[in-house]
Protein backbone atom coordinates (compact mmCIF):
# COMPACT_ATOMS: atom_id res chain seq x y z
CA UNK A 1 0.00 0.00 0.00
CA UNK A 2 2.83 2.38 0.86
CA UNK A 3 4.56 1.47 -2.40
CA UNK A 4 1.42 2.40 -4.35
CA UNK A 5 1.23 5.75 -2.55
CA UNK A 6 4.88 6.47 -3.38
CA UNK A 7 4.36 5.61 -7.04
CA UNK A 8 1.32 7.89 -7.25
CA UNK A 9 3.23 10.68 -5.51
CA UNK A 10 6.12 10.29 -7.96
CA UNK A 11 3.74 10.75 -10.90
CA UNK A 12 2.07 13.77 -9.29
CA UNK A 13 5.29 15.74 -8.76
CA UNK A 14 6.12 16.61 -12.39
CA UNK A 15 2.65 18.05 -13.11
CA UNK A 16 3.51 21.63 -12.02
CA UNK A 17 6.38 21.64 -14.50
CA UNK A 18 3.95 20.85 -17.31
CA UNK A 19 1.65 23.64 -16.14
CA UNK A 20 4.39 26.23 -16.60
CA UNK A 21 2.87 29.14 -18.52
CA UNK A 22 5.99 30.30 -20.33
CA UNK A 23 4.68 30.08 -23.87
CA UNK A 24 6.06 32.54 -26.39
CA UNK A 25 3.82 35.51 -27.21
CA UNK A 26 1.45 35.34 -30.16
CA UNK A 27 3.21 36.18 -33.46
CA UNK A 28 1.67 39.65 -33.91
CA UNK A 29 1.35 40.53 -30.22
CA UNK A 30 4.38 42.84 -30.26
CA UNK A 31 5.09 43.13 -33.98
CA UNK A 32 3.62 45.90 -36.10
CA UNK A 33 1.90 45.25 -39.40
CA UNK A 34 3.99 46.09 -42.50
CA UNK A 35 1.27 48.39 -43.89
CA UNK A 36 1.28 51.67 -41.89
CA UNK A 37 -2.43 52.30 -42.56
CA UNK A 38 -3.40 48.87 -41.28
CA UNK A 39 -1.17 49.28 -38.21
CA UNK A 40 -2.73 52.69 -37.50
CA UNK A 41 -6.23 51.17 -37.73
CA UNK A 42 -5.20 48.28 -35.47
CA UNK A 43 -3.58 50.63 -32.94
CA UNK A 44 -6.64 52.90 -32.88
CA UNK A 45 -8.87 49.91 -32.19
CA UNK A 46 -6.52 48.43 -29.57
CA UNK A 47 -6.58 51.72 -27.64
CA UNK A 48 -10.36 51.43 -27.25
CA UNK A 49 -10.37 47.82 -26.00
CA UNK A 50 -9.94 47.24 -22.26
CA UNK A 51 -7.50 44.63 -20.97
CA UNK A 52 -9.51 42.04 -19.07
CA UNK A 53 -6.58 41.32 -16.74
CA UNK A 54 -5.29 44.83 -15.98
CA UNK A 55 -8.69 46.53 -15.62
CA UNK A 56 -7.62 50.04 -16.39
CA UNK A 57 -5.29 49.67 -19.31
CA UNK A 58 -6.08 49.20 -22.94
CA UNK A 59 -4.74 46.14 -24.70
CA UNK A 60 -2.37 48.52 -26.52
CA UNK A 61 -0.69 49.44 -23.20
CA UNK A 62 -0.94 46.19 -21.25
CA UNK A 63 1.84 43.62 -20.83
CA UNK A 64 -0.58 40.84 -19.85
CA UNK A 65 -0.47 37.67 -21.93
CA UNK A 66 -4.19 37.92 -22.71
CA UNK A 67 -3.71 41.48 -23.98
CA UNK A 68 -0.92 40.23 -26.25
CA UNK A 69 -3.22 37.55 -27.62
CA UNK A 70 -5.93 40.15 -28.21
CA UNK A 71 -3.46 42.50 -29.96
CA UNK A 72 -2.38 39.64 -32.22
CA UNK A 73 -6.01 38.83 -33.00
CA UNK A 74 -6.78 42.47 -33.87
CA UNK A 75 -3.72 42.71 -36.14
CA UNK A 76 -4.49 39.40 -37.86
CA UNK A 77 -8.05 40.44 -38.59
CA UNK A 78 -7.07 43.93 -39.75
CA UNK A 79 -4.42 42.39 -42.05
CA UNK A 80 -7.11 40.07 -43.44
CA UNK A 81 -9.20 43.12 -44.38
CA UNK A 82 -11.84 42.92 -41.66
CA UNK A 83 -13.18 46.36 -40.67
CA UNK A 84 -12.45 47.57 -37.12
CA UNK A 85 -16.18 47.81 -36.33
CA UNK A 86 -16.62 44.10 -37.07
CA UNK A 87 -13.61 43.21 -34.90
CA UNK A 88 -14.99 45.35 -32.06
CA UNK A 89 -18.39 43.65 -32.38
CA UNK A 90 -16.73 40.22 -32.24
CA UNK A 91 -14.71 41.15 -29.14
CA UNK A 92 -17.82 42.53 -27.41
CA UNK A 93 -19.75 39.41 -28.36
CA UNK A 94 -17.01 37.21 -26.91
CA UNK A 95 -16.06 39.19 -23.78
CA UNK A 96 -19.10 41.39 -23.12
CA UNK A 97 -19.65 45.16 -23.22
CA UNK A 98 -17.11 45.74 -20.44
CA UNK A 99 -14.23 45.03 -22.85
CA UNK A 100 -14.93 48.26 -24.73
CA UNK A 101 -14.11 51.72 -23.38
CA UNK A 102 -17.01 52.86 -25.58
CA UNK A 103 -19.73 50.26 -24.98
CA UNK A 104 -22.81 50.32 -27.20
CA UNK A 105 -25.75 52.16 -25.69
Question: Predicted regions: what is each one?
Answer:
Residues 1-22:
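Hydrophobic secretory-pathway targeting helix
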Residues 4-6, 13, 51, 57, ...:
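Residue-level marker of intrinsically disordered, low-complexity segments enriched
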Residues 17-57:
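Membrane-proximal low-complexity regions enriched in glycine and acidic/polar residues
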Residues 46-76, 80:
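N-terminal, post-signal-peptide region of Sec/Tat-exported proteins
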Residues 70-99:
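Extended, hydrophilic extramembrane loops/domains of integral membrane proteins
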Residues 101-105:
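Juxtamembrane/start-of-transmembrane alpha-helix segments at the extracytoplasmic/lumenal side
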Amino acid sequence: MIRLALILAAFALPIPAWADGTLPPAPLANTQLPDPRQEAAAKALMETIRCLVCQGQSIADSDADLAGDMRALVRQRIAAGEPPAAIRAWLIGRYGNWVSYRPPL
